[in-house]
Amino acid sequence: MSEAIGTLVYAVVKYAAYSAWCLAGLAVARPGGAGGGAALRFGAIRWAIGLAFGVAVFVLVGSIDASAAARTYFLVYSPVRVVEWSIMAWLIRDRSRPLSTALILWCAGGLLVSFLTDLLSPEGLQGRFCVGRCLC
């Protein structure tokens, strides 16, 4: 598979995973109040947030030593993804209800979704860590 096709497949998988996870988040945040269309929109928003943060990481982190890639990947992306999923929780939550433990746990699950889908990136499929260009 060419790198361009691999990147496109990865982007689509990332979007699908984010949309599915946003559907779960909507069920937690707005029981009975939102469906698949909203999940697709929130999935697109989450994907775009990840792309923007990914470009920023690429610019700010710059070149890294290959021997430190795994450490750098987790040190950089763990807090970035906490911010990204917190933004999503703020966007999807029903503001008439208090913030719930379930929504906080949904954010934690979102971090896991983000990291697991990175395994399907072109770099991840080659056993490497992507830092700054993996669509967060």
Annotate each predicted stretch with a short phrase:
Residues 1-136:
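Juxtamembrane/disordered regions of integral membrane proteins
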